[in-house]
Amino acid sequence: MIRSQGIKGNGDRYDMSEMGCRYRRGVMILPSMCDSDSKLSIPAAFDMFQNMATLHADHFDIGPAGMSRRNYFWVITRIVMHFERMPSMMDMTEMMTWIQPADRAKSERDFALYSGDEKLFEGRSIWAVMSHETGRLVPMAGLFPDHIDFDEPAPELPLSKIGKDFEGCEEIGTYTIRSVDIDLGGHMNNVNYIRAMLGCFSSEKIRELNIKDMEVQFVSQSYEGSTLTFRCRRPDDGTLEIGALNEEGKAVFLARLS
């Protein structure tokens, strides 16, 4: 199939195979996106990816407006990211996102950030669709157009499991969920778990951790007014595993950092 590239008036670029699996957009790293070292922060990197996913989905009428008409909403269940380096404040970058074929209950969306030809970070994510009315998962069938050419491979980043049992593990902080943490699903936004988790550490400690790989799993929803307790453990492989536990002591969010 011959592929051409479309360019919209706002600078969006996307591969055209009757609207291909890829979507690209230039992104300047603004001050509000940066950490204390004037580099793109990890939460802002996750925000960038989610925003790109929304823009791409909107081309298929499964962005916020299209899903609202169906009374559905997207949820991310897992993300794994590898960081080579973070861009600096006011750098111009280009982000690309692309999708893999969906199965019955979930779909994979991948992403990468570039500075010219240099890949700065990349990731994989697993998504599902839920019904506002029932609160249950919705089958993926029919959401994506049949004519998409899925020809972009996923990054070579394994998706693993993180154990939910943090009994007796070190407590590193607590966080009470506020109104500003809530998204259109009525629960805590995914990226705000990451912000709350990293907020358990000082800027100096985050610098010392020098995070190159991060895997997160969103286990269940949390709501305004609830308090999360963050606990950590260090497996023999040298990684740092963190769990956010609700007031019943059950893990709602899991992360592995290295």
Question: Where do the protein language model's features map onto the residues?
Answer:
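Acidic/His-leaning functional-site neighborhoods
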Residues: 173-256
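Hot-dog-fold acyl-thioester-processing enzymes
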Residues: 2-76, 124-126, 131-210
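HotDog/MaoC-like acyl-thioester-processing domains
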Residues: 4-25, 80-165, 218-224, 233-258
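Exposed loop/turn and edge beta-strand positions of beta-sandwich/beta-sheet ligand-binding modules
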Residues: 77, 107, 212
